[in-house]
Amino acid sequence: MNLESSNLKISSERLDLAEKDLRTVGFHIFENVITAEDADKAREATLALAETEAQNGKGSIYGEDKIRRVWALVSKGTIFCQLIQNPTVIAIWKRFLGEDVIASTFTANIVGPDAPAGGWHIDYPYWAMSPPFPEGSLTGQTVWMLDDFTPDNGPTACIPNSHKMLRPPKPGEAEKHQMAVATAPKGSILFTNGAIWHQCLPNTTKQPRVGLLGMYNRSVIYPQEDMPRQLTDQQLENQSDMLKQLLGRKMQFRDPENGINWRRTETGFDTHDAT
């Protein structure tokens, strides 16, 4: 399945605004990054994949068994390989996280009917770190809206400026702050600073709310998923350099004893093309 629509060309002014928002309030919404038709294609593929995994006893279910997560999307469809390297997404994260940005995870998040709130939290690697967190940008989350995100169907909510606290929220603390609810038409993206306090709100509708979560790191931060193994060496042969970079296949590991550099493969390490 391919996305047929052309991606938006992002201006330097819009990049400036996105970066400013991520560093100040902690989030930025970019509407209509892909068309509604392409969002429908991705939604259909996501729901079909989730159903297959459920039948096979795979995937992850939480939130009173009403929220479903599908992991390792890059390995599960061409459409996901396209979305993870969307030019608008890459332009924003290169600006925020550096030219050598890598992917940490790419997953599906399906908030089913009557699902509860997801609970206030921060994203990896911050939840694996002891506060206070270092200042600056380590990671960012990309929330692909494959449905219209409305106030009632489980949208993402953020506490503006909370990333500046440099720590996770204490129990009951986030509720004392004014939250911002991310609503936008399908095909849009919510970009968030990885340290911001956020959660999905309850879905009080009768339809599932489908989104994709793409997390991107500075290259010095170890990814949450084992991204280099999501595609085989053969599958990667004709893929873009950008996808190879995102999967960590272009990172070099120095072997000083032998005077060579290693790179990750699907099964381990190799010196192929490493200089």
What label would you give each PLM region?
Residues 116-183, 221-231:
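Catalytic core of non-heme Fe(II) oxygenases with the double-stranded beta-helix
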Residues 105-108, 142-144, 212-216:
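A structural signal for short, well-ordered beta-strand segments
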Residues 1-25, 31-130:
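Non-heme Fe(II)-dependent double-stranded beta-helix
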Residues 165-191, 195-196, 201-275:
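Conserved double-stranded beta-helix
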Residues 66, 76, 104, 138-140, ...:
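Residues that flank catalytic or metal-binding motifs in active/ligand-binding sites
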Residues 35-36, 109-111, 149-151, 163-164, ...:
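Short, solvent-exposed loop/turn segments at secondary-structure junctions
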Residues 29-30, 144, 190-192:
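Short hydrophobic-aromatic micro-motifs
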